[in-house]
Amino acid sequence: MRILLIILCWALAWPVFSQKSKSRPDYEPLFGKSQASYKVTSSSLKGATFYLVSGHGGPDPGCIGRYQGKELHEDEYAYDIILRLGRELLMRGAKVHFIIQDAKDGIRNTSILKNSKRETCMGSPIPLNQIARLQQRCNKINQLHRKEKGIYKRAVFIHVDSRARRNQTDVYFYHAQGSTQGKAMARQLQRTFAAKYDRHQPNRGFDGTVSARNLFVLRNTTPVAVFMELGNIQNAQDQKRLVIPSNRQALARWIAEGIVKDYQRVKKK
């Protein structure tokens, strides 16, 4: 009789335990302590897989600009935005691989992101040699891609450009030569950004372009890929896009929303 009562109590309590476990947030330590916990709030990207790559890293800081007497390092801002983008994608139900990782940085809500050389390619030291560095991240993406199933697997590369200080540039998008799916994704991202600027800054316009480029990482990655340049790190206006944390978050959110639309396009086929 006592055993029956124990079983009955356990059966009655099980739905409560089950509900609690389902409501627990997911956890990604790369986001840092304050942002590591997140909840999946949508299934809009369920079944999609992403390989997220922030430019440069490790021994290579990428482009360097100056803002209020401080240095802005391309790799730090690209990495912060990649983390924010990854979190947005995970919250929409996607599977996300962060190819470049820094175990300490996390998502940072400061204007000046201090440079470090801690970044790795999923735990492996990043080579100084450019070709070796690029081949390393392509190899990692391709290895992961071969192991996974699904109709929508995308590599996203994020960089910051460096031009003459007077040249203000909008976000622009590259795809591999001959990649119809890469071009379609890039165009959807471009349309999303144009619509966002029309809404938030009427009459501003948006001049971000889409074009094919013969870049090493676009040539040598197996999944469909898009490569983004987020602005000119030397230009005062473009720097605001990078140094203001809410602007970095907006960039991540807009990219995620454009990706959702592209995923919906593919699923309709």
What are these regions (language model features)?
Residues R2-K269:
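Catalytic-site microenvironment of enzymes
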